[in-house]
């Protein structure tokens, strides 16, 4: 039985979580006024969003870097369409930092051909699938799946928040010339966090000292974030979103290649065939396992 409509709201072809999405914002997205110094982290769900929010916050806020201020990262870098904390996003002081799962075609019109910056983080979709599967089974506001096979069908059909992964990444990449955008690969960030932070800060035109970069790297490692209440989203999970059970955390593993521990050979090969068809001639590389990186550009094996 398909219960997706109970959990999802479809707006102009894209699925959103029904109870958390701010419809007033969605309906006014076209006319949302973008400032030149706005910065957006845009991802498909379960692709490093919270991690990149933490990095952005650390780059921009000295009080975060030196731990003199104890704001939640979600308050520093709120979601545009999921305004859970009811932030006055239009009147926030500059520079405004936002996170979003929006597809390219729902982005505010004035974000095109604008100085405002977008950091698009993408992750190999097999690990996205596994992370999304566990997350959906943990939170009450998403439809649980009894098996990975069941969730994989929904994921490939786009019956999940964010709709179809292939459409999301292709849409943003194929329209990259309309935006001031930097593409970052999750797996590269896992391999070399310091270099990734320097690349992001250079794109943002933020000149950081060695000490500041060191502080950002320390506080932005996935392992450390899991134990920082302001960064790990566990309080949001327990309060605004809600858990089905007490096992697990918002930040689960963040591992590269975790799909190998969950997908059967048949599921993996079936996913490979779909990936090769959907992503043929797509220029961005993908890393499926850090141990097999040399053979991992476009093959989903």
UniProtKB/Swiss-Prot annotation:
Disulfide bonds: none
Keyword Hydrolase: no
Main location: cytoplasm
Domain of life: Eukaryota
Residues the entry annotates as binding 3'-phosphoadenylyl sulfate: 46-51, 123, 131, 186, 220-225, 252-254
GO molecular function term, any single one: amine sulfotransferase activity
GO cellular component, one term: cytoplasm
Protein name per UniProt: Amine sulfotransferase
Lineage: Eukaryota, Metazoa, Chordata, Craniata, Vertebrata
Gene from which the chain derives: SULT3A1
């Amino acid at each position: 039985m398909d219960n997706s409509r109970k959990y999802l709201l479809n707006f102009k072809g894209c699925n959103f979580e029904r109870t958390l999405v701010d419809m007033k914002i969605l309906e006014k997205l076209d006319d949302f006024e973008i400032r030149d110094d706005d910065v957006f982290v845009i991802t498909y769900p379960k692709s490093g969003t919270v991690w990149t929010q933490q990095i952005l916050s650390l780059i921009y806020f000295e009080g975060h870097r030196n731990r003199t201020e104890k704001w939640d990262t979600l308050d520093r870098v709120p979601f545009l369409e999921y305004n859970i904390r009811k932030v006055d996003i239009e009147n926030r002081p500059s520079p405004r930092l936002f996170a979003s799962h929006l597809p390219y075609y729902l982005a505010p019109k004035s974000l095109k051909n604008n100085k405002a910056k977008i950091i698009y983080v993408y992750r190999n979709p097999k690990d996205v699938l596994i992370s999304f599967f566990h997350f959906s089974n943990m939170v009450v506001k998403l439809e649980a799946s009894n098996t990975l096979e069941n969730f994989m069908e929904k994921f490939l059909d786009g019956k999940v928040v964010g709709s179809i992964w292939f459409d999301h990444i292709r849409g943003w990449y194929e329209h990259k010339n309309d935006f001031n955008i930097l593409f970052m690969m999750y797996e590269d960030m896992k391999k070399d966090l310091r270099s990734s932070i320097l690349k992001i800060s250079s794109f943002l035109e933020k000149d950081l000292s060695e000490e500041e970069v060191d502080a950002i790297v320390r506080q932005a490692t996935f392992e450390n974030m899991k134990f920082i209440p302001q960064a790990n989203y566990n309080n949001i999970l327990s309060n605004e979103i809600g858990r089905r059970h007490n096992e697990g955390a918002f930040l689960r593993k963040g591992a590269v290649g975790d799909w190998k521990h969950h997908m059967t050979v048949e599921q993996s090969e079936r996913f490979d065939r779909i990936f090769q068809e959907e992503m043929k001639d797509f220029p961005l590389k993908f890393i499926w396992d850090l141990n097999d990186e040399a053979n991992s550009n476009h093959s989903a094996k």
